[in-house]
Amino acid sequence: MPAPALTGPQYLREGLKLILSPGLRLFVLLPLSINIVLFCGLIYLAVHQFELWVDTFMPTLPHWLSFLSYILWPLFVALVLLMVFFTFTVVANIIAAPFNGFLSEKVEAVIRGVDESPDFSWAELVAMVPRTLAREARKLGYMLPRMLGLFILSFIPVANIIAAPLWLLFGVWMMAIQYIDYPADNHKLGWNEMLGWLKSKRWQSLSFGGIVYVALLIPVVNLLMMPAAVAAATLFWVRERGADALPIAHARD
């Protein structure tokens, strides 16, 4: 008897439990560690270059402007914090894309009871990189023209009244696409087929996308929510597809 479907919040809660299990933690920690190291390195370089610039620039100013050194540093720190806040999640998604497909595959093995502690394989991960990056490019190709249309709509008098709710609805829909596409891609489901399936499960997809959208808005917490959303989307795939959700080994035959 197939397991019952869940609501969006239930899927995310179960996804969080899955990624915190001992057998899957490594698949979460690795991309997160890479992202943190990358940002720490970039921040270090930015601080070093800014310090050199201040040391070069300040001596050229009149003495009465020396107080600027006490203003420039706080401004720089504020700028760095804003940069991290607005770009960390975006960069994390790009870096994590191959890992997310890999994580989804391992989560599915655990869900199906095939393997409670799947092995990590660099060769398997590297083999997935071209396909997952191509799929990410396909998502951008779907998202950007629609964002442009909404952006233009936002400046049209009267019509712009509906722009805000449409932006929200589109953001929720893109969250469903972003994460449910990982298990769909692992099963070699074509892009249009995947979209068609999500549309056939429109309310379930929007429920899932909505809770993920809200969770990813929370700073720091969103770092854990990204892999949790991958696991939740994989569970969504297995539960909602029912008998059609063949194990990956069969899907690839």
Swiss-Prot record:
Main localization, broad class: membrane
A Pfam entry, by short name: EI24
InterPro entries: CysZ_sulfate_transptr, Sulfate_CysZ
Keyword line: Amino-acid biosynthesis, Cell inner membrane, Cell membrane, Cysteine biosynthesis, Membrane, Sulfate transport, Transmembrane, Transmembrane helix, Transport
This protein's GO CC annotations: plasma membrane
Highest taxon of source: Bacteria
Keyword Zinc: no
GO MF terms held by the record: high-affinity sulfate:proton symporter activity
A GO BP annotation: sulfate assimilation
Topology of this chain in the membrane: Multi-pass membrane protein
Regions crossing the membrane: 27-47, 71-91, 150-170, 211-231
Subcellular location: Cell inner membrane
Family of the protein in this entry: Belongs to the CysZ family.
Functional note: High affinity, high specificity proton-dependent sulfate transporter, which mediates sulfate uptake. Provides the sulfur source for the cysteine synthesis pathway.
Stated name of the protein: Sulfate transporter CysZ
Lineage: Bacteria, Pseudomonadati, Pseudomonadota, Gammaproteobacteria, Pseudomonadales
